[in-house]
Structures are given as C-alpha cells and as structure tokens.
Design a protein with these regions (language model features):
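Intrinsic low-complexity, repeat-rich intrinsically disordered segments enriched
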Residues: 1-39
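Extracellular attachment/recognition segments
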Residues: 25-116
C-alpha cells in the first residue's frame, strides 16, 4: 500500500486542480437570515433578505441547469418547517415557518450538481 502526502495539488499547468468526475458541493453557505450577512460561503455572491423567514442566495458561478440537489439546515428549536423555493441556475430561496408565522433563522446551505 502506498501513502500520498501533499500540501498542494495542482493541474499539469500549475494552476488549481478542477473538480471533475467528482460529486462535491459546488456551493455552500452559512447565512444569518436577519439581514444579509454571509458568515462563510463558497460560490455565493449575494444573500437577499426577501422578507421575514425568506432568503435567497445567488451563485457566483451558475449551475448547468435547475435540476440539482439542494439541502438546507436551519437553526431552530421547535416543530418548524423549512423548504427550498425558486430553484434556478443562478440561485435558490429558502423559507422558514414556525407553524404560525415566518421567522428569521440562521441557514446552512449545500448545493450539489454540475456547474455551467
């Protein structure tokens, strides 16, 4: 058995290695729904607060089509409902409902699919 140890992996031209023939998150983000704060992200250009409990992220690099896997996790402590809405090649929206009203909560996003 061989062991590969490396600090940097580059393409043959010396640039960054591209993710091909792999299933890896093409977008991830940790956002604060009470405003437009992005705590950390990859391939996210903006966060739009479109209303209480509703937020939309825009991708820096578009997806190849609107058929991709999107998951969210929202910070809440009750029997709440979260769902994704308006899935497009350029971004996606998430909504959070407490059972009686929409509420702003921190949201963690992960998008898997092909980039354009």
């Amino acid at each position: 058995m061989s062991t590969l140890k490396a600090d940097t992996i580059q393409s043959t031209s010396g640039g960054a290695a591209t993710l091909t023939k792999q299933v890896a998150a093409k977008t991830w983000s940790n956002t604060n729904a009470a405003g437009t704060t992005i705590n950390g992200s990859f391939n996210v250009s903006t966060l739009t607060d479109t209303g209480t409990g509703i937020q939309t992220i825009a991708y820096t690099s578009a997806m190849a089509n609107a058929i991709y896997s999107a998951t969210i996790s929202m910070a809440s402590d009750a029997a709440n409902h979260e769902w994704l809405d308006s899935q497009a090649t350029t971004g996606i929206a998430a909504k959070h409902y407490t059972g009686s009203a929409y509420a702003d909560v921190a949201t963690m996003w992960q998008i898997i699919g092909d980039l354009a």
